[in-house]
Amino acid sequence: MPKKTIYFGAGWFTDRQNKAYKEAMEALKENPTIDLENSYVPLDNQYKGIRVDEHPEYLHDKVWATATYNNDLNGIKTNDIMLGVYIPDEEDVGLGMELGYALSQGKYVLLVIPDEDYGKPINLMSWGVSDNVIKMSQLKDFNFNKPRFDFYEGAVY
């Protein structure tokens, strides 16, 4: 079975974001249509391997920031699909930028929302750039070889 690569967009700044991040990664490991090994996960590809969750002082380093930003853009351009882990009550502005950039590059954009948050209102712009919005529990079985458009069942704000 063919496999697709993804750009894994997800916040990791709060406990809820970290929980959703881990749940999504576990689901992707089980998904037979994803080539996770060759996909781009920003937290695993920060410049010179310096993770700002462990070394926040690098958030003030222009070389680190510029290189990490450009690597992330390359990750979006060179992977098949943009996947965004989205928490309606904790929107991450960086994810919003990544979603818009992916759309500009002609990428299929999939938002994944934790089941307990699915149906809550989401940002109009995040909704607008998304080709589909699914529950976290659907991620392990989502067929990335046959991406389709569908409407989000919740409202927008």
UniProtKB/Swiss-Prot annotation:
Its EC number is 2.4.2.6. It holds the Pfam family Nuc_deoxyrib_tr. InterPro entries: Nucleoside_deoxyribTrfase (IPR007710). Optimum pH is 6.0. This is Nucleoside deoxyribosyltransferase. It comes from the Bacteria. GO terms for biological process: nucleotide salvage. Pathway: Nucleotide metabolism; nucleotide salvage pathway. Changing residue 98 to A: Loss of transferase activity. The active site is at 98 (nucleophile). GO terms for molecular function: nucleoside deoxyribosyltransferase activity. Catalyzes the cleavage of the glycosidic bond of 2'-deoxyribonucleosides and the transfer of the deoxyribosyl moiety to an acceptor purine or pyrimidine base. Homohexamer. It catalyses: 2-deoxy-D-ribosyl-base(1) + base(2) = 2-deoxy-D-ribosyl-base(2) + base(1). Keywords: Nucleotide metabolism, Transferase. It is an enzyme of class 2 (transferase). Belongs to the nucleoside deoxyribosyltransferase family.
